[in-house]
């Protein structure tokens, strides 16, 4: 079992966590020309696009 040899300080762990950022998905253009978020159904046409 993996056990840390030394305690990791709060500052050090916080610095490491700064790189775990949430990336926002960019909108895509649907077949009818409207912009929507990916992996969602278009309410106008009912189409699903990645």
UniProtKB/Swiss-Prot annotation:
Alphabetized UniProt keyword annotations: Ribonucleoprotein, Ribosomal protein
SUPFAM superfamilies to which the protein is assigned, alphabetical: Zn-binding ribosomal proteins (SSF57829)
Keyword Ribonucleoprotein found: yes
Official protein name in the record: Large ribosomal subunit protein bL32
Family: Belongs to the bacterial ribosomal protein bL32 family.
GO biological-process terms attached to the record: translation
Comp. bias intervals (Basic residues): 1-26
InterPro entries found in the cross-reference section: Ribosomal_bL32, Ribosomal_bL32_bact, Ribosomal_zn-bd
Cited NCBIfam families: rpmF_bact
Region spans: Disordered: 1-50
GO molecular function terms listed in the Swiss-Prot or TrEMBL record: structural constituent of ribosome
């Amino acid at each position: 079992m993996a056990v840390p040899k030394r305690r990791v300080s709060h500052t050090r762990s916080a610095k490491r966590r700064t790189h775990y950022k949430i990336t926002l998905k960019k909108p895509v253009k649907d077949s009818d020309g409207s912009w929507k978020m990916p992996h969602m159904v278009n309410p106008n046409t009912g189409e699903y696009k990645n």
